[in-house]
Amino acid sequence: TAADGSFTLPGHERERFIFITTPSGYKTFNRHYHKIEEKQSGYDFGLMPYSGRIRKDGSHKYIHIADTEIFNTENHEDWVNNVRDYARNEQAAFIIHTGDICYEKGLKAHIKLMNTENMDCPVFYCIGNHDWVKGKYGEELFESIYGPVYYSFDAGNVHYIVTPMPGGDHAPGYTADDVCRWLKNDLAHIRPGTPVVVFNHDLLTYE
């Protein structure tokens, strides 16, 4: 990485995204990832200062939800609005959903209800076993809506990591080795003593 922020990556044939670890105190202009395009050689990530609901000492709260398993956008506004209002009242820095959004209809509907703009704070998603659906590979639809299935971000004084399960209702397009390779690289850049929290729907491996 150069002083002006430009970077060069050798690439990896199994990767479909380029993504960054959003640093604490900032947010991306649009999103933390870009899909790798065959004819595209440059990718830019715009960051802007963002304190969110993080205290000066770095401490913060977050809301963790899972298994909402919706199939449409009807009759869900009330509970989604309750989560949003609770996040505001508790000054939650972000919301994390750790999977089982649920099947094709749920994957397409959930993002319309619970997203960063609607919830008034960053919203992150993790894939669950019922979020692998029929396609070229199980997470294809999830990736097209929510982005990569493994990534990390910083909030306050904590490093957060999102990892997928080994598989679900349909075969994934990655292996545990792919995720572990990335995870080792991610952790190698963490300052010693930094608290680390890992989110997943179920363990990547039981070994």
Identify what each model region corresponds to:
Residues 2-11:
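Short, surface-exposed beta-strand/beta-hairpin micro-motifs centered on an aromatic residue
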Residues 22-24, 35-109:
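N-terminal active-site segment of His-dependent metallophosphoesterases
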Residues 23-26, 107-195:
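Extended active-site neighborhood of metal-dependent phosphoesterases/phosphodiesterases
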Residues 59-72, 157-167, 197-200:
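Active-site-proximal beta-strand elements of phosphoester/diester hydrolases
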Residues 64-66, 94-100, 122-129, 163, ...:
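Active-site neighborhood of phospho(di)ester-bond hydrolases with catalytic His/Asp-centered motifs
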Residues 194-197, 204-207:
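Long, structured stretches of catalytic cores involved in phosphate-ester chemistry, encompassing
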